[in-house]
Amino acid sequence: MTSDRYNARDAEPRWQAAWDQQAIFATKNDDPREKYYVLEMFPYPSGRIHIGHVRNYTLGDVIARYMRAKGYNVLHPMGWDAFGLPAENAAIERKVAPKAWTYDNIKAMKKQLRSIGLSLDWAREFATCDPSYYKHQQKMFLDFLRAGLAEREKRKINWDPVDMTVLANEQVIDGRGWRSGAVVEQREMNQWVFKITKYSQELLEALDTLDRWPDKVRLMQRNWIGRSEGLLLRFALDPATTPNGEGELKIFTTRPDTLFGAKFMAIAPDHPLAQAAAKDNPALAEFIAECKRRGTAQAEIDTAEKMGFDTGIRAIHPFDPDWTLPVYVANFILMEYGTGAIFGCPAHDQRDLDFVNKYGLGNTPVVCPEGQDPKTLVITDTAYDGDGRMINSRFLDGMTAEAAKKEVAKRLESEMRGNMPVGERKVNFRLRDWGISRQRYWGCPIPVIHCPKCDVVPVPENDLPVTLPEDVTFDKPGNALDHHPTWKHVTCPQCGARATRETDTMDTFVDSSWYFARFTDPWNETAPTTPEIANRMMPVDQYIGGVEHAILHLLYSRFFTRAMKATGHLSMDEPFKGMFTQGMVVHETYRKADGGWASPDEVGIEAVGNGRRATLISTGEPVEIGAVEKMSKSKRNTVDPDDIIGSYGADTARWFMLSDSPPDRDVIWSEEGVQGASRFMQRLWRLVNESAEAGKAAPRDKPATFGTDALALRKAAHGALDKVSTGIERLHFNVCLANIREFANTLAETLARFGTRTSDLAPDIAWSLREAATILVQLFSPMMPHLSEECWHALGHTGLVSEARWPQIERDLLVEDTVTLPVQVNGKKRGEVTVASSAPNPEIETAVLALDAVRQALGGKPARKIIIVPQRIVNVVG
């Protein structure tokens, strides 16, 4: 037996070198075994990995190591999502080129990731800023262009005049750019878009096939796609009230049943009718400008005060020519949703009710809850949006709301204005085409040329990649590509005239929408994928990443896979068979007396009574212990993975990340928890060494029979093996760790009873101890791979445990010899009885009736009936 402590600093780099030297994690594409593809969302090379990365990649690594041990051909690659704005910011702030900054960060982070002991195939590594990667992205852009999946169109955009770039709606805060603080302008610009809307219905329906995705993620995507069935209505306008004699206003509604409750029409500030009305109405023009200044993000609009401006235009009710409705420009209507216009029925829509209450337009209920007297239905501050019967609706009265919808559709579809029906059933989607144009340097160049004679001309494929110039400066606002003296000036490949390159680059979401396919054969120099290989290795069997990517990244990847199928690069529709969203790593916050934040390594904490007291280690100054929050640099509640690995080792960090909390929930970082993981690692090391000593007495061959104690240990070992195997497959890693701890306790108790002196050990006990220790090492090898290699050799095994096959479960050892049954008397639990699993009913009845609690409950009377549910429960009827 050894008394030495396990030395992680010595062992971990040694075993990492052994894995690398033998290239045991390299995946062969021609391997005939069944494949298993596990992938964590690849990181942005910011310069340092954070503790959340450790958790994310440890989760994937456990799966990869387990499936490899189960005999699968595992693909577990790593790369870098390397384009993006931070590199440009670094160029501005630190006077370092984006390329140099990015690749320096990759080098540093790769070293950190290697220190975690991840079983990655580094031979497949790439960065999305590698020309050898984005060359193929540019080729696919041209393929999409030919297939009608990429187009250039004019779009209204948010323009930051200081940063000179387009902003997403979410980047406009209180009418100002999130970064520059400049007042945002609404402009119309040519933008490149991917036609994701061509797949709206397919993307929606296919969510039902993704049964290994979290329900919340599928729901978020379902809501984002936003399918709604309704009616497209053409409201006639009173020409005497319109600026240019406009004849109609189109609206899309999902509630045509509420038409008789209409009180107003509302149009978006940038609706053509609003723009026309504002030309001769300065007050309206100012109102529209104010709406734009207040922000365009949906979340911001939803929470803003509802505001409107009466244009003076009147719309005519489709069922009554004498009934007109005022047309307002409203700040809560967006042009990109539906038609940019609505009719407002305030009694049955809260937003509309808030609006009419402000402007005194009143409301008329038209849907009455079942069983309620319509005369008593009064709407004041809360709209009724439930089902019911129609009231105050003329020919619809008495119908259900659903029947009323059909009746309105039937009548208006048959009524013609000109050569078009007044109403038309339509399916509407919230999803909009994906605008990919970004006015930034550090991104994938869009491979088109603008010619004054030929218009938009694709770059010939033999001229790909269109690479970024490196001699750029960032001394002017806007896109450095626009300012470059030569890069954008080219000759048109069609006519030879002077032309210019497209200076917009692609949204970085494009880079991450197909990288998983490239990993299947990153050595292909002529095409994005090798279809034969990609179709065999894909889809990704288990994808892991944060829930913050539940909508855009995952939805764009699903679109891209379909677009790649349409252009011959893949043959499947869905990229990810299984999706798992891990929780965050969170930490307490510590606030100093001056209001500043202290980092965990600056704070000392001691127990005081039933509470805790925190002070600054340097000064003894009291520190307020704040809420447990997501780790952030601003609140300084971060933990450096290098410090943890340097102090305790990677296996300790990995084990802590997997323990206690289910992996889909947040894990609270605590120094005590890390120390506990470190102590358990040392305990495992001692246990294995003691077992190795005892195992020296074990016969080479498995004994023919086992005594009671040896059999009990074997049952515990194979029971743990079964539970941990099931737990990993179900991603219940914290449960697996609890099972391993429990089994380690059983092994320790057995060693304590029998000792390790080989002369004192019976062959069956010695053999069982060696088997149990071997199984234990293999159970924790996916979680603590370095320790497991050290333990594997301590037990006398040759080779690497990382290459060993997962132990076979002996199912007959999982059958329990006894079973404990709860006993009820007249429906109330009175006790339990333990009997042999194979005990016949008469034997069980005798044991039950012998229980004192049962005799007392029966009051000395015989039982009238005993009902035995096999292996479950016994019911005694007195």
Curated annotation (Swiss-Prot):
Concerning PANTHER family, the annotation shows: LEUCINE--TRNA LIGASE, MITOCHONDRIAL, LEUCYL-TRNA SYNTHETASE
Residues annotated as coiled-coil are: none
Chemical reaction(s) catalysed: tRNA(Leu) + L-leucine + ATP = L-leucyl-tRNA(Leu) + AMP + diphosphate
Descriptive protein name: Leucine--tRNA ligase
Q: What is its EC number?
A: 6.1.1.4
Q: What GO biological process term is on the record, naming one? A: leucyl-tRNA aminoacylation
Task: Give the lineage.
Answer: Bacteria, Pseudomonadati, Pseudomonadota, Alphaproteobacteria, Hyphomicrobiales
Give the matching CDD domains. Answer: Anticodon_Ia_Leu_BEm, LeuRS_core
The record, for InterPro entries, names: aa-tRNA-synth_I_CS, aa-tRNA-synth_Ia, Leu-tRNA-ligase, Leu_tRNA-synth_edit, M/V/L/I-tRNA-synth_anticd-bd, Methionyl/Leucyl_tRNA_Synth, Rossmann-like_a/b/a_fold, tRNAsynth_Ia_anticodon-bd
Q: Where is this motif: 'KMSKS' region?
A: 630-634
Similarity comment: family membership: Belongs to the class-I aminoacyl-tRNA synthetase family.
Task: Give the signal sequence positions.
Answer: none
